[in-house]
Amino acid sequence: MPILLSRDNLKKIITVTDAIQAVEEGFRHYKGGHCDVPVRKEMRLDENQGIFLFMPAFMKPGNVFGTKIVSVFPNNLQRGLSTIQGVYMLNDPTTGELLALMDGIFLTSLRTGAASAIATKYLARKDAAMLGIVGSGGQAAFQAAAICKVRPIREIYVYDTNSQNARDFSETASRDLTPVSYTHLRAHETNPCIS
């Protein structure tokens, strides 16, 4: 019987530090040619204005095979659902047996934050104490938490066109990580930067 791991389960068993170490190890194995990571396959459901993304991977060290399946349905906002949903399946690569089903969105956010921390670890100054984050959506907290593990961050600046999201992020990160300043940018102020 496969193990089912929800977001709450995963939060209890995987730390940001664990994620950084695992992702860095995965990068080393990938660079060493020990991983098989095919190009992401997508399936569009135009009639429902959605898309499914399939991302399998096999890592020879550890004999690990997993597949992430993500769906993106922008109209879910009107349904009160998240636009992005996902699951991660872990299979036994010898037998194909399903070992676990895990919340794919939490793992993706944790992995993406960890990847940013690894880039920061090797590319940023050792004494970097300020962090700038553009956008305060769901990924922002993971980025901040991971980067705070590899640098002595004392201030975080967040910019967002949604002032409520920026305030919410600022309050949470100030409580959990380090003081956060935020700036609210209205869309018309950002357009010159984009065009």
Task: Identify the residue ranges that each predicted region occupies.
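Acidic/polar active-site rim loop that often engages polyanionic ligands
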Residues: I3-L5, C148-P152
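Conserved N-terminal glycine/acidic-rich loop preference
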Residues: F106-A128, N165-L177
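Glycine-rich adenosine-cofactor-binding loop
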Residues: S116, A128-C148, D160-T161
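NAD(P)-binding Rossmann-fold cofactor-contacting core
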Residues: R151-A173
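Acidic, proline/serine/threonine- and glycine-rich low-complexity intrinsically disordered segments
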Residues: P179-S181
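Conserved small/polar residues in nucleotide/adenosyl-binding loops
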Residues: T183-T190
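N-terminal ligand-binding/catalytic initiation module
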Residues: M1-S109, A117, D127
